[in-house]
From Swiss-Prot:
InterPro entries: DHAD_IlvD/Edd, Dihydro-acid_dehy_C, DihydroxyA_deHydtase, DiOHA_6PGluconate_deHydtase_CS, ILV_EDD_C, ILV_EDD_N, IlvD/EDD_N. HAMAP family: IlvD. It comes from Schizosaccharomyces pombe (strain 972 / ATCC 24843) (Fission yeast). [2Fe-2S] cluster binds at residues 84, 157, 232. This is Dihydroxy-acid dehydratase, mitochondrial. Keywords: 2Fe-2S, Amino-acid biosynthesis, Branched-chain amino acid biosynthesis, Iron, Iron-sulfur, Lyase, Magnesium, Metal-binding, Mitochondrion, Transit peptide. Gene3D superfamilies: IlvD/EDD C-terminal domain-like. Dihydroxyacid dehydratase that catalyzes the third step in the common pathway leading to biosynthesis of branched-chain amino acids. Catalyzes the dehydration of (2R,3R)-2,3-dihydroxy-3-methylpentanoate (2,3-dihydroxy-3-methylvalerate) into 2-oxo-3-methylpentanoate (2-oxo-3-methylvalerate) and of (2R)-2,3-dihydroxy-3-methylbutanoate (2,3-dihydroxyisovalerate) into 2-oxo-3-methylbutanoate (2-oxoisovalerate), the penultimate precursor to L-isoleucine and L-valine, respectively. It catalyses: (2R)-2,3-dihydroxy-3-methylbutanoate = 3-methyl-2-oxobutanoate + H2O; (2R,3R)-2,3-dihydroxy-3-methylpentanoate = (S)-3-methyl-2-oxopentanoate + H2O.
Length: 598
């Protein structure tokens, strides 16, 4: 096999692992004539009545033989202005070459994208979650409108992965996701070449305004945090969702761990051609792979790794695309029985580059399967079960310090907690690793915009020893709109050394890079008159991550008085894409989807 030869010429254990993981996809012996694999594209390539369609395809360079081949849509979330995405066009070309070698016809197309890291802390972040829906809509539109028989999608940044998987669930034709890969760690010359990443850049501002670092050090950090292409390196949203996709069986083994620009990633791209051909032959579709058991596996992996709160929104939305209902209670049930064992950023020390060196996500899955935490019987895009795929991988490296044994976890239960109570009757999602404690009671400081909080922090209005619950509201699906991520405020709190003194609560979201005492996705949101809209400065708020409660300690009589005089503010946008989004988006607890009939 060509891709195995490519890997064999590379040095090192990682390349050998990749060769082992990708073997078994050789399908050149399959006779496409024996089994019709172009059952969708034949709608336009077959009938004489579709002569105009065929004329346009000939114009693209197809010949008579090509017209009989299955057509594969190769979707890339490529754009130049983001390290997570800037290399994806090249990966798409490599996938197309693999598709061609497998005897199929590949057509590349693109989606839009929004960089969370670049838009963070600005109104541009309102477009981030919405981009998930546009990505899903665009891939679905091209696949259905062009009658492609199969799909390979290549995502990079946070919302790309769920957008691709939602689309695959909707059109339900043989599909594979090829993750763009993680960035390598940066190093700060001003700090003895200490490893740094994008969250280091975010936290540098809080460190600077509190005098912990000087301006040359701050600039050094932001200059060296991101050394090249690839998604943010910690167990943030991109790596969380790529790992979830692999756990569900929608990627080739190892995809979520292979670094951007690595020989393993290039080999995976070529192998996708043979793999998609096998899926066509066996007629294995996304809804055959993304079963309830597969989603359970993804939730378990997320809890063990300390993954992003965004996984809750995204997995609920992906499940909906394949006709499965996931709820907040499903996540809490998994969290109750799943230990948190990964010492990975943002709450820990290591990044995906380090995890890859000890075996990557396949070795983690192999360990969890051996311990009975995940179901290995689920079918995957290899045509084999998850357990069969994992046999080709080594156990976690002996003596490694990144993944703890289940007998000695960082936390005996998962870090994601679903909290309900008088402040969040329909639920909220907390990211609590235990380092910041399990309970928090403090007085509310209420802000209707995140930059108002940043200004208050700059003025020194928050002190150590004063327990404060900062509320940033009107940032929900409709009110934001788009549930902007609060990485700028959470990073500023941690950078200022206030992680144990200030809890942050919002109807918006948190980046996968956030850490601290954080509660997001508060439902109902402020825009629709949820209790969070009625909170006033000085109100006492009690957070209990053991009992999973979130309560506003204000009596019902006073709440009724506040409710009687409250009026909903107008939507922030009166035209354009965000108005359409605000009018159609569901609640956070339902995944913030825009194609619901409810």
């Amino acid at each position: 096999m060509m891709f195995c030869k490519l890997l064999r010429c590379q040095n090192g254990i990682a390349s050998k692992r990749a060769a082992l993981s990708l073997k078994g996809f050789k399908t050149s012996s399959i006779n496409l004539v024996e089994k019709k694999l172009n059952k969708y594209s034949e709608t336009i390539t077959g009938p004489k009545s579709q002569g105009a369609s065929q004329a346009m395809l000939y114009a693209t360079g197809l010949n008579e033989e090509d017209m009989k081949k299955p057509q594969v849509g190769i979707a890339s979330c490529w754009y130049e202005g983001n390290p997570c995405n800037m290399h994806l066009l090249d990966l798409g070309r490599r996938v197309k070459e693999g598709v061609k070698k497998a005897g199929l016809t590949g057509f590349q197309f693109n989606t839009i994208g929004v960089s969370d890291g670049i838009s963070m802390g600005t109104t541009g972040m309102r477009y981030s979650l919405q981009s998930r829906e546009i990505i899903a809509d665009s891939i679905e539109t091209v696949m259905q409108g062009q009658w492609y028989d199969a799909n390979v999608s290549i995502p990079g940044c946070d919302k790309n992965m769920p957008g691709c998987l939602i689309a695959m669930g909707r059109f339900n034709r043989p599909s594979i996701m090829v993750y763009g890969g993680s960035i390598r760690a940066g190093h700060s010359p001003c700090q003895n070449n200490a490893p740094i990443d994008i969250v280091s850049a975010f936290q540098s501002y809080g460190e600077f305004i509190t005098g912990k670092i000087d301006e040359p050090t701050r600039h050094d950090i932001i200059r060296h945090a991101c050394p090249g292409g690839g998604a943010c390196g910690g167990m943030y949203t991109a790596n969380t969702m790529a790992s979830c996709a692999e756990a569900m069986g929608m990627t080739l083994p190892g995809s979520s761990s292979y670094l951007a620009g690595s020989p393993e990633k290039f080999a995976e791209c070529e192998a996708a051609g043979s793999a998609i051909k096998r899926l066509l032959v066996d007629d294995i579709k996304p809804r055959d792979i993304m079963t309830r058991s597969a989603f359970e596996n993804a939730m378990v992996l997320t809890m063990t790794l300390g993954g992003s709160t965004n996984s809750v929104l995204h997995l609920i939305a992906i499940a909906k695309s394949v006709g499965i209902t996931l709820t907040l209670d499903d996540f809490q049930a998994v969290s109750n029985r799943t230990p948190f064992i990964a010492d990975m950023k943002p709450s820990g020390k290591y990044v995906m580059e380090d995890l890859f060196a000890i075996g990557g996500i396949p070795s983690v899955l192999k360990y969890l399967h051996a311990e009975g935490l995940i179901d290995g019987s689920n079918i995957t895009v290899t045509g084999k079960t998850l357990a069969e795929n994992l046999r080709g991988f080594k156990d976690l490296a002996e003596g490694q310090k990144i993944i703890r044994p289940l007998s000695n976890p960082i936390k005996t239960e998962g870090h994601l907690r679903v909290l309900r109570g008088s402040l969040a009757p329909e639920g909220s999602v907390a990211k609590i690793t235990g380092k910041e404690g399990l309970n928090f009671t403090g007085k509310a400081r209420v802000f209707d915009a995140e930059n108002d909080f940043i200004a208050a922090l700059e003025r020194g209005e928050f002190k150590k020893g004063e327990k404060t619950v900062v509320i940033i509201r009107f940032e929900g699906p409709k009110g934001g709109p788009g549930m902007p991520e609060m990485l700028k405020p959470s990073s500023a709190i941690m950078g200022a050394g206030l992680g144990k003194d200030v809890a942050l609560l919002t109807d918006g979201r948190f980046s996968g890079g956030s850490h601290g005492f954080l509660i997001g996705h508060v439902d109902p949101e402020a825009q629709v008159g949820g209790p969070i809209a009625l909170v006033q400065d000085g109100d006492v708020i009690e957070i209990n991550a053991v009992k999973n409660t979130l309560d506003l300690m204000v009596d019902e009589k006073e709440m009724a008085r506040r409710r009687s005089v409250w009026k909903a503010p107008p939507l922030k946008y009166q035209q354009g894409t965000l108005l359409k989004y605000a009018r159609n988006v569901s609640t956070a607890s339902k995944g913030a989807v825009t194609d619901s009939l409810e």
